[in-house]
Amino acid sequence: VTVFLAVILVMLIGSFSCSKGDYSGKVETVAIGATPIELNALIYVADEYRFFTNNGVQVVFKDYDTGVAAVDGLLKREVDMALTTEFVIVGKSLQKQDVLDLATIDKSMLFYIIARTDRGIKTTADLKGKRIGVPRQTITGFYLGRMLELNGMRIQQVTTVDTKASDPAGTIAGGDVDAIVTWEPQVTQIRQQMGNGVIIWPAQSGQVSFWSIASTPRWINQHPDLVRQLLKSLAQAEEYIIQHPAEAKKILQRRLKLDDTYIATVWSQNQFLLSLDQSLILAMEDEGRWMIKNNLTREKQIPDFMNYIYVDGLKAVKPEAVKIIR
């Protein structure tokens, strides 16, 4: 009986992964630049259950420390696509660099400000005059600036220090900075290592971060069918996560070597859904104005961010997920 049930289970899994996208054409390779974090859940599930290959896509991964590093790799043609925040796409648009957002694959609330209590920091007001670590050109600088503004301060009233995104725990534990802005799972790691030696605040001030899959106009124009095939695979992964959250969590745990407690904590802080909606545009405009206000660009006006979003791919695969007002 046990053997019979096991065979049935294998058949059901195989049916789920194959019936969604039987593909008899040429399988093409797509190189994706990514930071290995749980925000990539749709990507990892699609890879694990062969949704990519069943739709004619062979995905290979190249790891980067940050989304901005992944996009820089994209622009250097090291990869075909990059996973990044909308903030990076905003920055590239203000630099007149061609990067298009294909779809949001996750909305999250995973960024935090972590401060050392032995530096006299008990409230956010105590951050004034302190050295705060933020990885260069990432969305952490925006979140820090916004949080300071909401607490009556300006980012010029702190000293920002360009820190390595790969080792925030070492940076704050080593005492090079008084505080740091970082994201999960590093936040949990620092909390476990330093305990009461740090105080932690949410950094995003209620604004979700959009984790996007991006590419260049050149590559998209050369591979429109491949874009649709990849997004179709992610739509199938989204359906799988909705129907089988426990199995999806196990995939993340195996892939990223995460424990049960961590996954249980952060799962609800993510929305693993494909989308292109108006809230993305509003966030990009807000971030663009912030960059201009803080002289992080030579531009004086924000661009039309619709010019940096490619809607045709997602419209073809999941039209109800496109909710942008033109």
Task: Identify the residue ranges that each predicted region occupies.
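Solvent-exposed, polar/charged alpha-helical surfaces in well-ordered, non-transmembrane soluble domains
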Residues: 41-45, 49-50, 72, 76, ...
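Ligand-binding clefts/hinges and TM-proximal coupling segments of bilobed small-molecule sensing domains
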Residues: 138-154, 232-264, 303-306, 316-320
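Short, low-complexity disordered leader/linker segments with a strong preference
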Residues: 1-29, 319-326
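Short amphipathic alpha-helical segments at helix boundaries and their inter-helical linkers
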Residues: 79-83, 174, 270-286, 313-322
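Short, glycine-/small- and polar/acidic-enriched structural segments
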Residues: 23-164, 178-184, 198-207
